[in-house]
Amino acid sequence: MIDVIVLGAAAGGGFPQWNSAAPGCVAARTRQGAKARTQASLAVSADGKRWFILNASPDLRQQIIDTPALHHQGSLRGTPIQGVVLTCGEIDAITGLLTLREREPFTLMGSDSTLQQLADNPIFGALDPEIVPRVPLILDEATSLMNKDGIPSGLLLTAFAVPGKAPLYAEAAGSRPDETLGLSITDGCKTMLFIPGCAQITSEIVERVAAADLVFFDGTLWRDDEMIRAGLSPKSGQRMGHVSVNDAGGPVECFTTCEKPRKVLIHINNSNPILFEDSPERKDVERAGWTVAEDGMTFRLDTP
């Protein structure tokens, strides 16, 4: 069994973004036709009791408060969170680590590049490596997600490289192949994928998606130039390291023949019209077989 909780579904800045009066953010703030969302993160478990966090969003404290499954019970302090797995070193994937600094043991997993980016920033020393050990992920090699007591959780994790880029704060050092990861998690029978950032959909990614049972995929933008057209930013989706949902080479087109998995769009930017519940774009992706992620959504992959 694999249980999944969507802790957050939005891209960096959240929905609504704190400084935005764009139509989507106004709709979310006033609760008129669009639901607010925190920044993208998942919780996964094999038993519904011990959980692993996929990306530590800046909203992680509130996400934990809003998720009873992540509440500690019993002793004065503790947590059912066993570990955190990072897909990249972007600010909206790592900032929440600082919320977990209260001398609480858990395992922190990421690529060599991401763990080095954390090591290069002394603020993350607040997570004492003696208490929060760093575990480098070896690409394309399955590893058991271990509970804090040293017992296997029942989940196997495989990290794989996907096209992307270095975080904005680290771009001067250039990009490495392990800057952006996809995660495959299996209980031996069912498999889920988490790919919240992807600059190009390769044939390998299509093969992985076709074989999976549940897929969370990059839904940042509807079209590559939408932020430019809206006057929100001079950056395109490609400049930010993201394919766009409805463009040629995007997930709607590339995964049309992938009929096995349930497909969920996550990491959705506040400019994306699929966030409007009655928009034509929302109807288009739903007709194409996609679910638009919302905070608090739960999924279960049952083992036969």
Curated annotation (Swiss-Prot):
Which SUPFAM superfamilies does the entry link to? Metallo-hydrolase/oxidoreductase
Any one of the GO BP annotations: pyrroloquinoline quinone biosynthetic process
By its UniProt entry, which InterPro entries does this protein fall under? Answer: Metallo-B-lactamas, PQQ_synth_PqqB, RibonucZ/Hydroxyglut_hydro
Listed pathway(s): Cofactor biosynthesis; pyrroloquinoline quinone biosynthesis
> Which of UniProt's keywords are assigned here?
PQQ biosynthesis, Transport
Record keyword Isomerase present = no
Q: Which residues cross the membrane?
A: none
Pfam families attached to this UniProt entry: Lactamase_B_2 (PF12706)
Kindly indicate whether the keyword Cytoplasm belongs to this entry.
Answer: no
Q: Which HAMAP family does the record associate with it?
A: PQQ_syn_PqqB
Q: What does this protein do?
A: May be involved in the transport of PQQ or its precursor to the periplasm.
The Swiss-Prot or TrEMBL record describes its family as follows: Belongs to the PqqB family.
Protein's name according to its UniProt entry:
Coenzyme PQQ synthesis protein B
Look up and give the organism this protein is from.
Gluconobacter oxydans (strain 621H)
Lineage of origin: Bacteria, Pseudomonadati, Pseudomonadota, Alphaproteobacteria, Acetobacterales
Q: Give me the gene this protein comes from.
A: pqqB
